[in-house]
Amino acid sequence: MSDEEIDISTALNNKTTPKKKSLKRNSNSQEGYESPEEREIVYPSVFGAIGTPMAKSDNAKEWDEWKEKERKKDKAEWKRYLRSKWDMTQGHLPLVSDSEFLKGRKEHKEYNSKARMDILDGLDEVNEGFFNCGKGAAMNIRYNDKNVSKKGAKKFVATVETAMKKAGNPTMEQMMTDDLDEDEARAEAEWERQREQRKLASRAYDAAMDEREDDAKYVPWDEYCQEMEELGKELKIGEKHYKKWLEKKMDENKVTHKFNAYQLDLKCLDEDAFSNKKSLKSVVRNVQKFYRKMREPKK
């Protein structure tokens, strides 16, 4: 007996079944695929050596075929890459959303669809004439998917008829317009009330601003009286002395914001004050002469 026969016999007498050798995948789906952006592009031979300027292709068909092949390859790789990303996160997606804005959305959708169907059924009944068949007729009323008893329906009809009699049995159009008129009058009254409030607030703001401007307004007479009191010359306070004080201050404050205030007070006291050499007109004229002399060519 040969060695091969011995090996076969031992294999047959062995109770354990030999293991089946299967090909194992090198990559795991949980590990994911390499991003297509990291793939190295192999250019066709028409480009020449890598690093040299692009050569002009003599065969345009070869170039188009290569572009189409690369496009399909990129599309397949992107699809495989994105699919692997989805497989990795698919098991971790929450079955129920934790967002407070999405809680109970299924129940909300069911309630909406149910209410919509109830409204459609009610409209069908109204159109078919089953809801309100006239005075004294039987009325079928459903509330929360339950039929109201005939006694309750008659009581409801009697209550409605009593309210209509008190209102003078108005038509549907009159009731609609009356409600609109009441709402419009209410809205106009509210708008008028808000308008009066805005008016009062605006007047109070304007008064406060005027008072602030008056407080901030410069008054030469107040400065004159304060200065004379500090010097102890309260008895000399008068119109003639005030004129001299204004002329002195005008001479000292030719380039300040107080100059105009001094000028106006002096004009109110003496109409002939502007004939003085210290007046604003004479000062402006002297400044103009000065600049005119400066512009003249030097001899």
Curated annotation (Swiss-Prot):
- Provide the disulphide bond pattern: none
* Superkingdom of this protein's organism: Eukaryota
Any keyword Nucleotidyltransferase?
Answer: no
Query: Which GO biological process categories is it annotated with?
Result: eggshell formation; prevention of polyspermy; spermatogenesis
Which cellular compartments is it found in? Cytoplasm, Perinuclear region
Q: Which UniProt keywords apply?
A: Cytoplasm, Developmental protein, Differentiation, Spermatogenesis
- Gene null: resulting phenotype: Worms fail to complete meiosis, form a weak eggshell, fail to orient properly the first mitotic spindle and fail to undergo cytokinesis.
Q: Name one GO cellular component term.
A: perinuclear region of cytoplasm
Record's keyword annotation contains Cytoplasm = yes
Q: In which tissues is it expressed?
A: Expressed in mature sperm.
Renumbered residue ranges of the record's region Disordered: 1-38
Q: What does this protein do?
A: Paternally sperm-supplied factor required for embryogenesis. Plays a role in preventing polyspermy possibly by promoting the formation of a continuous and cohesive eggshell chitin layer.
This one is known as Spermatocyte protein spe-11
The taxonomic lineage of its organism, from the top, reads: Eukaryota, Metazoa, Ecdysozoa, Nematoda, Chromadorea
